Swiss-Prot record:
GO cellular component: cytosol
First-listed, main subcellular location of the protein, grouped into a coarse class: cytoplasm
Entry keyword Cytoplasm: yes
Residues involved in 3-amino-2-oxopropyl phosphate binding: 6, 17, 216, 237-238
Superkingdom of origin: Bacteria
BP-aspect Gene Ontology terms: pyridoxine biosynthetic process
Name of the protein: Pyridoxine 5'-phosphate synthase
Pfam families in the record: PdxJ
Recorded family membership: Belongs to the PNP synthase family.
Gene that this sequence comes from: pdxJ
Enzyme Commission number(s) of this protein: 2.6.99.2
Source species of the chain: Helicobacter pylori (strain J99 / ATCC 700824)
């Protein structure tokens, strides 16, 4: 299993104060020196709430690890990434809403302009992945447009797992639609969400599409996904950075790697 470390929220801390620390490159090399991280993931958002264009340039110039850049189909961002001298290892196209706290679901593959953006990256020799819900239509769209990777949105699975097996429902930011559900109902929905991820991962495998996954994964809910044999990569960020605040980044990375690289 490949471990993609998302370092967006290290930069979030920097941007809160508009200062120079924490240093994104220091985080990069801490990750590299653990010898457990396979790639670095960053999300270049339209609103630039964390990662900035300059961060992209600096990372691509010196990173010893592959860089996966998440982004929308925004024309300005597409032009910027296509113009880069140092190319990312892949671009993962994600849905984006300026009012969202975090990505809320998978990409709508009928989105106007999506096909043109995929072609633009392919023409520059940049591999494309699509951040999608685990659905057949998304896989067929990827296959039709020569997209060799998808990343399944695991938010539904993760939220259900957290509601059932952690104290998430008692926290200040509990998800209202899950808070009042009984354990039996949560368990059934969680089982179905996992089965859907497993079924669609198998479907993708037989279609020749590499399957990655991410969103909302943490030290508790990630273990079940290791039972999906066709899953090749997990991208995890917020939970690792959250733990790093308390125990340090190196230890937080190693603890996650111990779970997913067994």
């Amino acid at each position: 299993m490949r471990f993609g470390l998302n370092i967006d929220h290290i930069v979030t801390l920097r941007e809160v104060r508009k200062t120079y620390e924490p240093e994104i490159l220091e985080a990069l090399f801490i990750a590299k020196n653990t010898h457990k991280v396979d790639l670095i993931t960053i999300h270049l958002r339209e609103d630039k709430r964390h990662i900035q264009n300059e961060d992209v340039l600096r990372l691509l110039e010196i990173s010893p690890l592959p860089i996966n850049i998440e982004c929308s189909i925004n024309a300005e961002i597409t032009d910027f990434l296509c113009s880069l001298k140092n190319k990312p290892s892949k671009v993962t196209i994600v849905p984006e809403n300026r009012n969202e706290v975090t990505t809320e679901g998978g990409l709508d593959c009928s989105l106007k302009g999506l096909e043109e953006v995929i072609r633009a990256y392919h023409n520059k020799g940049i591999e494309v992945s699509l951040f999608v819900d685990p659905l057949k239509d998304a896989l067929h769209f990827a296959k039709e447009h020569q997209v060799k990777q998808v990343e399944f949105h695991t938010g539904v699975y993760a939220n259900l797992h957290n509601a059932l097996y952690s104290n998430a429902n008692n926290q200040i930011h509990a998800i209202s639609t899950l808070k009042d559900k009984c354990p039996k109902e949560l368990k059934e929905e969680l089982h179905n969400a996992f089965l859907q991820l497993r079924r669609m991962s198998k479907e993708a495998f037989f279609m020749g599409i590499v399957v990655c996954a991410g969103h909302g994964l943490n030290y508790s809910n990630v273990k079940e996904l290791l039972k999906i044999p066709s899953l090749r990569e997990l991208n995890i960020g917020h939970s690792v950075v959250s733990k790093a605040v308390l125990v340090g980044l190196e230890k937080a990375i190693l603890e996650m790697a111990q779970l997913i690289k067994r």
